[in-house]
């Protein structure tokens, strides 16, 4: 066991334009090869497209999409007596948001379309409405957890 103290949680910084932590989390997840300015560009273009499509506050659409995709429970593989069980575990809010962002970006990358900003904006609008690939992924995870409810005591 380590004698060091526990590391304190780092608070996520907010982005320069919208002053929003969720936007910054999105930027950091979309980032590839250290090109942060390109990541910001993609996110801001996607937010503008959301504004044009919905004619509402794009940050509220973003919040609604992430809230809709955030899972409450997930399954974790746990080895017990030679066999591996999928054990349902509860997920904290920060980890849930991170998963939701990962699923949203994965679903938007798989979408057909012109560019990433267009695909991301479409996925976010769909997720806010309650449809789309990321929402399906969340429902799939919840079904998996419900199916393996019998193994919850292995936690």
Swiss-Prot record:
Signal peptide: none annotated. Pfam families: Ribosomal_S7. The keyword Plastid applies. Coiled coil: none annotated. GO terms for biological process: translation. InterPro entries: Ribosomal_uS7, Ribosomal_uS7_bac/org-type, Ribosomal_uS7_CS, Ribosomal_uS7_dom, Ribosomal_uS7_dom_sf. It comes from the Eukaryota. It is found in: Plastid, Chloroplast. GO terms for molecular function: rRNA binding; structural constituent of ribosome. The keyword Plastid applies. One of its GO terms (cellular component) is small ribosomal subunit. Keywords: Chloroplast, Plastid, Ribonucleoprotein, Ribosomal protein, RNA-binding, rRNA-binding. Part of the 30S ribosomal subunit. One of the primary rRNA binding proteins, it binds directly to 16S rRNA where it nucleates assembly of the head domain of the 30S subunit. Belongs to the universal ribosomal protein uS7 family. PANTHER family: RIBOSOMAL PROTEIN S7. This is Small ribosomal subunit protein uS7c. It comes from Spathiphyllum wallisii (Peace lily). The gene is rps7.
